[in-house]
Regions:
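Membrane-water interface of transmembrane alpha-helices in multipass transporters/channels
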Residues: 48-57, 76-94, 154-169
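Hydrophobic transmembrane alpha-helices
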Residues: 39-42, 59-60, 82-106, 147-150, ...
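Hydrophobic, glycine/alanine-rich multi-pass transmembrane helices and their short helix-loop junctions
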Residues: 39-43, 132-196
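Hydrophobic alpha-helical segments of membrane proteins
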Residues: 31, 35, 64-72, 101, ...
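Small-residue-enriched core segments of transmembrane alpha-helices in multipass membrane transport
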Residues: 52-73, 162-180
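Alpha-helical transmembrane segments of multi-pass membrane proteins
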Residues: 25, 29, 58, 128-140, ...
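Structured non-transmembrane domains adjacent to transmembrane bundles in polytopic membrane proteins
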Residues: 1-51, 58-72, 76, 81
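Cytosolic juxtamembrane regions of multi-pass inner-membrane proteins
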Residues: 97-136, 148, 152
Length: 202
């Protein structure tokens, strides 16, 4: 029965629900924009199709592993923590921050490899030289980020703890397994196809 009265809900709970709904509705669009823009920028920068595809794939792989570990620790309750929930905003923040940092490491490494390749080195030799010359810098930068964000793990505020642990884990995975192992392996696997661009001139 229509009573002619409008009901409106307010309060912190309603506010939180609206925020979560907005994130859930727009997160896929945001991720798509990030991935497409990253692909275009890297394709233009390195004049390659394979390099940006590989970079995006490696980032998604590392972030997927990170989210799995976060669920294992915080949602299932391990390492002395009670089972709980992961705040919805946490994966979004971790994705955006880590995706940017990981791409920074990727550009730094691939730029050095490309520099050697353009000098006339084979793809394999360029990959080895690029890795050797950048591994210490990438590892040092990653360690600084891990220490800074890892310190958040000691707070009692759960969202802050989750952000700190998530970023620290993601950077650790990216700087070791991804950047120093998988990326060079893929570079060697694809060989000269790494630098292929269908409409490249010359």
């Amino acid at each position: 029965q229509d009573l002619g009265v409008d009901f409106k809900l307010s309060g912190q709970a309603k506010f939180n629900q609206e925020i979560f709904d907005e994130i859930a509705n727009k997160v896929l669009v945001a991720i798509a924009i990030i991935i497409v823009s990253t692909f275009i920028i890297l394709m233009i920068a390195f004049r390659s199709i394979i390099i940006p595809l590989k970079a995006i794939l490696m980032n998604i792989l590392g972030l997927g592993a990170t989210f799995g570990i976060l669920v294992y620790i915080f949602q299932y309750g391990h390492f002395g923590l009670e089972a709980g929930t992961i705040v919805l905003i946490i994966p979004v923040l971790v994705f955006c921050l880590v995706f940017g940092l990981s791409m920074d490491y990727e550009v730094f490494l691939i730029s050095r490899i490309q520099e050697e390749y353009l000098k006339g080195a084979t793809n394999t030799k360029a990959t080895i030289d690029g890795l050797v010359s950048t591994s210490k810098i990438i590892t040092s930068a990653a360690l600084i980020m891990i220490v800074i964000t890892g310190a958040f793990a000691f707070t009692e505020v759960m969202p802050v703890k989750q952000i700190g642990v998530g970023i620290a884990i993601a950077i650790a995975i990216d700087a070791t397994i991804i950047r120093l192992m998988l990326v060079p392996s893929f570079m060697k696997l694809f060989g000269d196809w790494n630098w292929w661009l269908p409409f490249k001139k010359g």
